[in-house]
């Protein structure tokens, strides 16, 4: 059913769908159910836990660990092999549990259509499950109901539908049954009602033209299900890291093999030694620590109102270079609020407060007097069909958003709305074609009339001496500021007769009262959050279905843009898109605000930014945001949004505050920082082991540490301390850095320098002490090895403090900020001394007791590692200061 139903008249629609006003017969319904199927959306195939579990093994670093594990078992290092297997399984379980809870898009989409529908079948009104609807069914809508399928409206009475979840527009749309032109965008199709949208007021009759996946929401559902998940920066970096690590290990193995070959070692012995060295150089604990780091940051995010559904999204948010935000409900409250009142004599009043509540006051400008708006405020309460009440410690509202805003205005003026509604004798409901609504009410002995609506319509009722041009200028000025404006007028009826229906000719000559300006206010935290995003190197753009003037007004208030040239519309985007992707991408780079945008265009914008090399996070709360949320590098849903958005997004902002996104960025960057810190520690220690290993072989010394002792360092010392580093809090300047390039290798210049320099210093230190113990002091190899093992433990203990920051001094971060690190070092030292002093354990570790004075000397020998690290950091900070930028 791909016809443009909004362009077809009622008679032809009945003909095309082979239906009638009396509705379909039961026989016709059964035939069509077989033809079109149930009115349900396509479901994504849900993965079992086992499937999710095995997917965790599709990771390059896991491949290396699996190979290492197999080699460990081949050469008889069963403990090492078992440990690596344990690490792989733990990592897989942790990842599986997190992933299994996420990504249930189809179920959430289906929730939108689990509603009953009132239909006419066999010339009778009946209620049926919406899933049983078929094209051609006649559906009846009333206030408070949800639209059960895509409908072409054929009759309407005062119908207003909230389509914000589909179009992004904050203002409910007034509907009619009139034919429209082909150029109408989705939000302008006033003779259509779409699945999942809500009827705010009025009644209507419509014909089902599309069901299930053929509806507008169905199209979005298909886009969501067909869009592949994007790869996060951490995944990209780990893939590169794995390749680099594999290459380095291969080069290392080749070097050692060459040395051993020329020294006359047997082939079997060379194989065992090379494999053992390769095993010691692989950071077996890294996958678990990465998962743990992301989990810790995920928990921190939850405490800061960011719920993480997909673990990789934790770090991904910290890499964002663009945040494409929905306007309605994300940057604004989606609660129309009266902000200004302007009287014909130019008296102006500012109204404070935001949203649907009684918080705020009415402030007169200059010589304006508060009592002069008394009549206008009361008219807004008489001529009102919404409700706003304070129930169980919260404000509850229903009805048209602008009517609700007028009730809020009444509360700020200390007036209760219910008493006014009781005096209403009759109404003329708002119709978009008429452009006004009217209420007849009793006030004392008089019967008065209150009329509100578009300016020109209200002025046509007014005959009193009014400077209409002056009022038009007032209205124009308010519209340019992005306000939505209602005009008010009042009059008295001399002869009033109560009847069922009132018409325009029942309205007497009126007196113009003034203009009321409404705005969907920005969220209090949004402006500062956007400013902070800018400092963090993140550009914020707005994508909305609203009018360009409204969008520009909000963007200007948020300081997103200052020039109208930065705004574009859906029609303009369509023209540029058709001219080719290159032109489209260039065009997108120049824009900050995108208005009147369709869901598919949102997706096109996201894809354009990705082609431009940006790493884009998309926020949203409606169904219309789902394709973009899914396609984005990071999808961020609002907690009060639709289930569709929340299930599609990788993150959910539980308090709906834009500032919480900034919290997420901070924690995301912290998570990646911690991954780098752990990598720095593990690899620098691994390099040190390789250095003293190669030096010993090359210079004909016994190896300073046995395979068991190397394993002890890898499993216990590294294994405990690297976990503690995962708990590091974010550094003070983390939100003043530019986002890292998603394509940047984990092994960037800084990390390479740190790992190689510190690893080299540690390795040479250990080898120097080894020579001194053997050649100068004449220690037995086993005794010397005990000293070297303790020296390595001390070096790794102190190096943990170096790893707390790649740039800042260890003295700039209070130790108390990471209590886990202190505990881990204490535990490592305690275990080390217990093992040395216990005869059974020391035998397993091939270790001997060490005199206290030797312990002191070894500790002092490990201190220079801090000095070297501090010098390296000093030069890095100096480089940053000179470049005025982060590496």
Specify the residue positions occupied by each region the protein language model found.
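Conserved cytosolic headpiece of P-type ATPases
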Residues: 1-739, 744-747, 760, 774-775, ...
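Generic alpha-helical transmembrane segments
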Residues: 717, 762-763, 786-800
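Alpha-helical transmembrane segments of multi-pass integral membrane proteins
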Residues: 754-769, 830
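A C-terminal functional module that forms or caps the active site or interfaces directly
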Residues: 803
């Amino acid at each position: 059913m791909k016809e443009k139903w909004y362009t077809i008249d009622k008679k032809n629609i009945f003909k095309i769908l082979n239906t009638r006003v009396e509705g379909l017969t039961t026989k016709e319904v059964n035939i069509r159910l077989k033809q079109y199927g149930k009115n349900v959306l396509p479901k994504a195939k849900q993965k079992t836990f086992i499937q999710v579990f095995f997917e965790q093994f599709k990771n390059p670093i896991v491949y290396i660990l699996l190979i290492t594990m197999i080699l460990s078992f081949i050469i008889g290092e069963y403990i090492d092999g078992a440990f690596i297997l344990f690490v792989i399984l733990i990592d897989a379980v942790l990842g599986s549990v997190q992933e299994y809870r996420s990504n249930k898009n189809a179920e959430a989409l289906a929730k939108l259509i689990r509603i009953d529908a009132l239909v006419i079948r066999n010339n009778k009104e009946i209620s049926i499950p919406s899933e049983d609807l078929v094209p051609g069914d006649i559906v009846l809508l009333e206030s408070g109901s949800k639209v059960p399928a895509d409908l072409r409206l054929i009759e309407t009475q005062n119908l207003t539908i909230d389509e914000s979840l589909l179009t992004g527009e904050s203002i409910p749309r007034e509907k009619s049954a009139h034919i429209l032109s082909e150029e109408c965008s989705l939000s302008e199709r006033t003779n259509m009602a779409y699945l999942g949208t809500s009827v705010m007021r009025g009644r209507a009759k419509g014909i089902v033209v599309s069901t299930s996946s053929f509806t507008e929401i169905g199209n979005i559902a298909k886009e969501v299900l067909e869009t592949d998940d994007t790869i996060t920066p951490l995944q990209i970096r780990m893939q590169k890291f794995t390749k680099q690590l594999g290459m380095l290990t291969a080069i290392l193995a080749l070097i050692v093999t060459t040395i051993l070959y020329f020294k006359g070692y047997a082939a079997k012995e060379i194989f065992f030694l090379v494999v053992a060295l390769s095993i010691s150089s692989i950071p077996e604990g890294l996958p678990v620590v990465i998962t743990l780091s992301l989990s810790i940051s995920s928990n921190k995010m939850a405490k800061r109102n960011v719920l993480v559904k997909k673990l990789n999204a934790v770090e991904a948010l910290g890499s964002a270079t663009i945040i494409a935000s929905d306007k309605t409900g994300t940057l604004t409250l989606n609660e129309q609020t009266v902000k200004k009142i302007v009287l014909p004599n130019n008296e102006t009043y500012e109204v404070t407060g935001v949203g649907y509540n009684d918080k705020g006051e009415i402030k007169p400008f200059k010589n304006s007097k508060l009592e002069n708006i008394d009549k206008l405020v009361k008219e807004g309460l008489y001529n009102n069909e919404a409700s706003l009440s304070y129930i169980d410690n919260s404000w509850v509202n229903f009805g048209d958003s602008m009517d609700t805003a007028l009730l809020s205005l009444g509360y700020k003026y200390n007036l209760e709305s219910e008493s006014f509604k009781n005096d209403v004798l009759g109404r003329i409901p708002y119709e978009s074609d008429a452009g006004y609504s009217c209420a007849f009410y009793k006030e004392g002995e008089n019967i008065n009339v209150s009329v509100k609506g578009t300016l020109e319509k209200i002025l046509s009722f007014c005959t009193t001496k009014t400077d209409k041009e002056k009022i038009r200028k007032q209205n124009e000025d308010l519209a340019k500021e992005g306000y939505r404006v209602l005009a008010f007028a009042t009059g008295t009826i001399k002869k009033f007769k109560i009847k069922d229906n009132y018409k325009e000719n029942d309205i007497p000559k009126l007196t113009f009262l003034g203009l009321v300006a409404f705005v969907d206010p920005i969220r209090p935290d949004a402006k500062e959050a956007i400013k902070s995003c800018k400092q963090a190197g993140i550009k914020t753009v707005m994508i909305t279905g609203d009018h360009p003037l409204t969008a520009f007004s909000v963007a200007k208030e948020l300081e997103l843009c200052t020039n109208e040239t930065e705004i574009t519309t859906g029609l303009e985007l369509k023209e540029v898109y058709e001219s080719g992707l290159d032109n489209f991408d260039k065009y997108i780079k120049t824009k900050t605000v995108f208005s009147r945008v369709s869901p598919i265009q949102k997706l096109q914008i996201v894809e354009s930014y990705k082609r431009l090399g940006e790493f884009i996070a998309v926020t949203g709360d409606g169904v219309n945001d789902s394709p973009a949320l899914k396609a984005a590098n990071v999808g961020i849903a609002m907690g009060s949004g639709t289930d569709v958005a929340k299930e599609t997004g990788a993150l959910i902002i539980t308090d709906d505050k834009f500032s919480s996104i900034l919290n997420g960025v901070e924690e995301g960057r912290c998570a990646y920082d911690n991954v780098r810190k752990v990598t720095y520690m593990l690899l620098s220690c691994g390099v040190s082991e390789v250095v003293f290993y190669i030096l010993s072989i090359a210079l004909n010394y016994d190896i300073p540490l046995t395979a068991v002792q190397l394993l002890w360092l890898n499993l216990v010392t590294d294994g405990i301390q690297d976990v503690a580093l995962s708990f590091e809090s974010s550094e003070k300047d983390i939100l003043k850095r530019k986002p890292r390039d998603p394509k940047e290798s984990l092994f960037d210049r800084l990390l390479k320098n740190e790992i190689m320099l510190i690893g080299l210093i540690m390795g040479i230190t250990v080898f120097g002490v080894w020579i001194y113990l053997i050649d100068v002091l004449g220690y037995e190899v086993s005794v010397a090895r005990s000293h070297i093992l303790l020296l390595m433990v001390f070096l790794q203990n102190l190096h943990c403090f170096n790893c707390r920051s790649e740039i800042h001094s260890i003295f700039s971060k209070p130790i108390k900020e990471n209590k886990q690190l202190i505990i881990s070092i204490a535990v490592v030292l305690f275990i080390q001394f217990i093992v040395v002093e216990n005869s059974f354990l020391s035998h397993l570790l091939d270790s001997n007791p060490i005199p206290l004075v030797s312990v002191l000397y070894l500790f002092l020998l490990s201190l220079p590692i801090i000095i070297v690290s501090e010098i390296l950091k000093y030069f890095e900070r100096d480089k940053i200061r000179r470049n005025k930028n982060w590496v």
